[in-house]
């Protein structure tokens, strides 16, 4: 199920954001992807990590870090880059914090069969570092 979900999500995001989706492959197998672009809240001039997903079997191999670094480099013209993460996804929150993101307050409810909370995180660029 997880692999099918990844492939379906990858297809969705690569079609919705074709110029802004990077895909990680292991041979002919999609093992992860990241989609990014302008922040979807048009009142804020910023970048956004729209989706990041890596198959569980590939955790700890640096794939998410490589995808994130590439997306952040592409979005470096923005002073802030936002993302939304499931509040209960401690592993993802820890990863994003390691990549320089911090929780900045706003939460929203996402309907995934049942309501789940998402937290907004932000990474502010610091050209001096």
Say what each PLM segment does.
Residues 51-69, 86-94, 98-99:
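Conserved glycine-rich acetyl-CoA-binding loop
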Residues 72, 79-80:
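Short, contiguous strand/loop micro-motifs
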Residues 1-57, 68-74, 126:
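Acetyl-CoA-dependent GNAT
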Residues 46, 80-93, 97-99, 105-129:
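C-terminal "cap" of GNAT-fold acetyltransferases
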């Amino acid at each position: 199920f997880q692999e099918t979900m990844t492939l379906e999500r990858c297809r969705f995001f690569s079609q919705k954001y074709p110029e802004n989706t990077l895909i990680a492959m292991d041979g002919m197998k999609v093992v992860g992807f990241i989609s990014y672009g302008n922040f979807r809240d048009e009142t804020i001039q910023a970048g956004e990590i729209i989706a990041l997903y890596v198959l569980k079997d590939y955790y700890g191999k640096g794939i998410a870090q490589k995808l994130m670094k590439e997306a952040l480099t592409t979005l470096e013209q923005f002073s802030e880059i936002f993302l939304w993460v499931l509040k209960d996804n401690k592993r993802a929150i820890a990863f994003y914090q390691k990549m320089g993101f911090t929780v900045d307050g706003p939460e929203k409810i996402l309907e995934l069969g049942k309501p789940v909370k998402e937290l907004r995180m932000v990474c502010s660029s610091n050209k001096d570092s």
